[in-house]
């Protein structure tokens, strides 16, 4: 959540002003629950996850209402750039070197890393992982179990994350949603 807060608030303040920043911060605080210090790992995770859902599901309509669909596209572009900054570094440099010698090896490494990065979002299985394709099967998306989360799916899963992995990791990401289940297919970019 620190990533979301450190990226979202500056975006809102830059494009909408300090008053809008205070307004979204107030909205977030109204829905956030404290993480129980004496709770189990699972309890802490569930509260933190619900807090992230609250943060994410409120920012998209907030931006859309004040900036329109073009503003939402600007926000999405800024989020992609923030993800690229967060996930850059020496490992990405090494991945680029590997890709120069073997696209399929680099893809396999990236697909495994994407699986690791996405595991906190929702439970899934990986029924297929080859040097040219990875399939992530989500039988019941945890995000969509919460009310008013269509934008997280539509903007985040269908647009922001695919742009990010294409630009930073040279991987195409396609989502195929059926109700609350989804199949994500990763392939090396051409």
What residue spans do the PLM features occupy?
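N-terminal accessory segment detector
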Residues: 1-133, 140-156, 173-182, 189-190
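Conserved glycine-/histidine-rich ATP-lid loop and adjacent helix of the Bergerat-fold HATPase_c
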Residues: 167-168
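Mixed-charge, glycine-accented linear interaction segment located at domain edges/termini
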Residues: 160-164
């Amino acid at each position: 959540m620190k990533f979301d807060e450190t990226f979202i608030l500056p975006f809102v303040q830059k494009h909408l002003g300090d008053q809008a920043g205070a307004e979204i911060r107030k909205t977030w605080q109204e829905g956030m629950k404290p993480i129980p210090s004496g709770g189990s790992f699972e309890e802490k995770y569930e509260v933190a996850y619900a807090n992230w859902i609250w943060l994410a599901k409120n920012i998209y309509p907030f931006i859309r209402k004040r900036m329109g669909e073009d503003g939402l596209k600007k926000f999405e572009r800024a989020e992609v750039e923030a993800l690229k900054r967060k996930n850059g570094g020496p490992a990405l440099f090494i991945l680029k070197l590997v890709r120069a010698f073997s696209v399929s090896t680099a893809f396999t490494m990236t697909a495994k890393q994407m699986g690791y990065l996405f595991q906190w979002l929702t439970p899934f299985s990986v029924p297929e992982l080859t040097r040219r394709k990875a399939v992530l099967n989500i039988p019941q998306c945890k995000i969509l179990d919460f009310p008013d989360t269509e934008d997280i799916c539509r903007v985040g899963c269908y647009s922001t994350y695919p742009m990010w992995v294409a630009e930073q990791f040279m991987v195409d990401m396609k989502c195929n949603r059926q109700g609350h289940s989804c199949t994500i297919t990763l392939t090396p970019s051409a």
